[in-house]
Amino acid sequence: MVFGIIWGAKNTLPEFAEQIKLLLGFGPVRQGERVLINGIPYRVEMMGVYSYLKNPLLTGGTLRLPLKDLVGMRSRPYDEKEPWFPCKEGDYVLIDGLSTWRQVKLQTPEETVFNWFEMEESMPTSSFMGRKIFNISATPFWAGINFSIAYKHRFEALGDLRDKLSKFVEEEIKKQPYGEHILYPWVDLAGFGDDSSLTFMVWVQAAPEAAHKYGAMSLDLTHIALNAANKYGWEIIRFKPVAVHHPEQAKVLLENSSTAVG
């Protein structure tokens, strides 16, 4: 029996000593600092037998943890500019590329819920934090298509054709419901397709106020490019959606693709 008590004390005393260090402010987790739990940042609000940690951007974002659960964790000082979460409820985000566009409906420590045309879907918040998130409600963003026309138009591609397409896109996109939030149209020759076509990038940059219309922008640009082709008699080869965040990336991808094919 005595041996059992000694053996138990041998195993528990080191952990108990670590808890005492935490309470006295000498441990690796300190009040007022930032700590990660399941990939989610929290601010250590209070240290005690039960400690309180908070993420201000999460619904139900206050955790109450027994002190022993903090043993083995490590906090750090943080800067006020550091975000506590990639987005807030109501924001529109792109997840792992331009094709997955969702509105954030609810975010808790366990689950992030999205709204997509009145349909709900969710994923564990820890998984969401591991994805590539682009918050288009927080910063200007790009939307666009690649528009391919016949190679026979090559002699005017860098002159009259590009100028006409650029002007047409600029005029027509501003007629859309979100037109006042369009910052900059970008039309340029991006490269050559495998089928002897000329591929143009047709992009627009929009302010965050237009984030709720992101889903319509690529479709609207397709309609606008089609109308331009019909007006000026250009032979269309294809339209192609893009899955990058900026037109320069689209251009690089096309150049690499052309090199690989060659």
Please give the residue ranges for each predicted region.
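Conserved hydrophobic/aromatic pocket- or pore-lining residues that grip, position, or stack substrates
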Residues: G32
